[in-house]
Swiss-Prot record:
The keyword Signal does not apply. HAMAP family: PlsX. Homodimer. Probably interacts with PlsY. This is Phosphate acyltransferase. GO terms for biological process: fatty acid biosynthetic process; phospholipid biosynthetic process. It comes from Pectobacterium atrosepticum (strain SCRI 1043 / ATCC BAA-672). The keyword Cytoplasm applies. It is an enzyme of class 2 (transferase).
């Protein structure tokens, strides 16, 4: 099996090394061909490795970093002051050829800006997009982009996102001729902003894209499309809403449906039935847990960069690491570049 080396921004996110280091060890234990470069403050990382098996330690290296980019820092300021930070060093490891991908739970805007600066976009791509794969009710998955990298998008960018999303659906989900839709406020052709209508017209004229038209937000998890395209503002709000609803739903399955007084009045068999239903429903809908699809790929770069949710726990960050491995092994940047060369005009 081909060995992979990934760089992890160990200091990024809400919890830093307390989450990233255990997640890294979990990924190493599950993947014997994986090597990891943990970028961050050795004083914060090393104590968490004290009782780790020697085999795992042999595939792990701590790369020192002087500082960390704050999650609330303005991207422009963070980029100017980024030298010596864990995020920048992790990205530089890709640029220098020491790592094949980077995973960070840090500041999204800073990660986007530094990735464009250091890794560079693919030929024909104006701006990379954050993309994730979400489960739907038909027991399949849908590629969704942009999830927050670009708040404002013109029609050309939306078409580029559609091309990249289509390639990802083919390579990661192994779909043939994946369906592509634009997220809009209605399915009628006259609905939506001018940029969306212009993108729709261009997609209709792109033979390599199986464009099926507009879909609304309530269609996101129905399985009506394999790729859903939108600007970063709409995508981020949509993703956070879906995650919030799913977490609420799963928490309701695990908690009593009635108050303390009603709970005391229930007979033993009703209590038993309630626990049984909670267990079965939790198992039935557990695949919707946002932790299981954490990690958005910054698609459109010459290398692989994965953005983990800032509030990710150990399990979720480990999923982001797995996604980075899958993206590298599928050679996604190279395959997107080949498709772009065939269907999009080169930028001047």
């Amino acid at each position: 099996m081909t060995r992979l080396t990934l760089a992890l921004d160990a200091m990024g996110g809400d919890f830093g090394p307390c989450v990233t280091v255990p997640a890294a060890l979990q990924a190493l234990a599950s993947n014997p061909a994986l090597n990891l470069l943990l970028v961050g403050d050795p004083a914060a990382i090393t104590p968490l490795l004290a009782k780790v098996d020697s085999d795992l330690l042999s595939r792990l290296e701590v790369v020192p970093a002087e500082s960390v980019i704050a999650s609330d820092a303005r991207p422009s300021q963070a980029i100017r002051a980024s030298r010596g930070t864990s995020m920048r060093i992790a990205l530089e490891l890709i640029k220098d050829g020491r790592a094949q991908a980077c995973v960070s739970a840090g500041n999204t805007g800073a990660l986007m800006g530094l990735a464009k600066l250091l890794i560079k976009p693919l030929e024909g791509i104006e701006r990379p997009a954050l993309v994730s794969v979400l489960p739907h009710q038909q027991h399949g998955k849908t590629v969704v982009l942009d999830l927050g990298a670009n708040v404002e998008c013109d029609s050309t960018m939306l078409v580029q996102f559609a091309v990249m999303g289509s390639v990802m659906a083919e390579e990661v989900l192994e779909l043939t001729n994946p369906r592509v839709a634009l997220l809009n406020i209605g399915e009628e052709e006259s609905k939506g902003l001018s940029t969306i209508r212009e993108a729709a017209a261009q997609l209709k004229e792109t033979p390599s894209i199986n464009y099926i038209g507009y879909l609304e937000g309530n269609d996101l998890l129905t399985g009506k499309t394999d790729v859903m395209v939108c600007d970063g503002f709409v995508g981020n709000v949509t993703l956070k809403t879906v995650e919030g609803v799913v977490r609420m739903f799963l928490s309701l399955l695990k908690s009593p449906a009635s108050g303390p007084e009603q709970k005391q009045k229930r007979s033993w068999w009703l209590k038993w039935l309630g626990r049984l239903l909670q267990k079965r429903l939790s198992k039935r809908f557990g695949h919707l847990n946002p932790d299981q699809y954490n990690g958005a790929c910054l698609l459109g770069l010459r290398g692989t960069v994965i953005k983990s949710h800032g509030a990710a726990n150990q399990r979720a960050f480990a999923v982001a690491i797995e996604q980075a491995m899958q993206t590298v092994r599928r050679q996604l940047p190279e395959r997107i570049a080949a498709r772009l060369e065939a269907v999009l005009p080169k930028s001047d």
